[in-house]
Amino acid sequence: MKRRTIEITAELIEEEEGGYTVYCPELDIYTQGEDVEDALANLREAAQLHIEEVGPQNLKLRKVERQELTLEVHA
């Protein structure tokens, strides 16, 4: 069976009450973990389960473009 490698983005958000939420925009999946390592491991597992569910041949990655914006905030 042919294998391919894909790259996905992990956006980590530190939660006020503790732990981390992590989002993968290419696959549109969220998960969480107690620390960064745990959150990333959970994302890897969730991504692999998602790919198995849809089937590698049917996998469609959303195109993600990142741009940083600077905003002026008046206090």
Question: Which residue ranges define each predicted feature?
Answer:
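Short amphipathic alpha-helical segments
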Residues: 21, 37-40
